[in-house]
């Protein structure tokens, strides 16, 4: 829930890009919950194998960059790497692989869309570019103007991700959906549907949100 609160706080001050990065994290959390609901302990074991391999990889990275350590620390670390060399055989997890064949598989499309804003892509950096001056030199706007439609889209996606988490946790607990949760889902669908109406004449692929 800390992510949700942070998204709201960022939205209130117009930090859309930063909010979208956190919404992306919310979707990733929903993938894990959905997979846990689907595969239970089997997925828990996959998570453990993933963590083992990543720990060894991080350890190997320290040696590759020849970071300076105290002799005793380096000796213990090398021994740890030797004792856990079998951890390299584990499989690593990816968001796309985790969400595959789960109840929220289609939401990976939104995650992929948000991933553009989580990296220094040309799309992301273009937010800060101003038209070129008379000498052909582009300008930089460190505080680009807020785009209300993008902020609304971000909050809409955040609601979608949070609902996925709530229903996933409900499945993990093997509980019946509460009336409050059902009402929230119905309200979201109604708002999302209403938000699409003004954009019926837009080009295919665009989404309207409310």
Q: Model-found features: residue ranges?
A:
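A cross-kingdom marker of C-terminal helix-rich interaction/assembly modules
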Residues: 1-210
């Amino acid at each position: 829930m800390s992510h949700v609160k942070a998204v709201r706080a960022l939205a209130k001050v117009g930090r859309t890009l930063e909010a979208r990065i956190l919404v992306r994290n919310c979707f990733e959390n929903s993938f894990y919950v959905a997979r846990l609901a689907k595969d239970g302990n089997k997925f828990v074991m996959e998570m453990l194998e993933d963590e083992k391999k990543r720990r060894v990889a991080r350890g190997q990275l320290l040696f590759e960059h020849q970071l300076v350590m105290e002799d005793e620390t380096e000796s213990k670390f090398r021994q740890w790497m030797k004792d856990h060399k079998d951890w390299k055989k584990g499989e690593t997890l990816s968001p796309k692989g985790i969400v595959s064949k789960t109840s929220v598989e289609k939401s990976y499309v939104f995650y992929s869309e948000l991933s553009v804003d989580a990296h220094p892509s040309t799309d992301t950096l273009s937010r800060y570019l101003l038209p070129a001056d008379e000498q052909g030199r582009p300008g930089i706007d460190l505080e680009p103007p807020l785009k209300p439609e993008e902020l609304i889209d971000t909050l809409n996606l955040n609601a979608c991700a949070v609902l996925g988490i709530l229903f996933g946790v409900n499945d993990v607990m093997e509980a019946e959906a509460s009336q409050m949760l059902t009402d929230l889902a119905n309200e979201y669908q109604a708002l999302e549907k209403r938000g699409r109406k003004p954009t019926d004449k837009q080009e295919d692929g665009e989404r309207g949100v409310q």
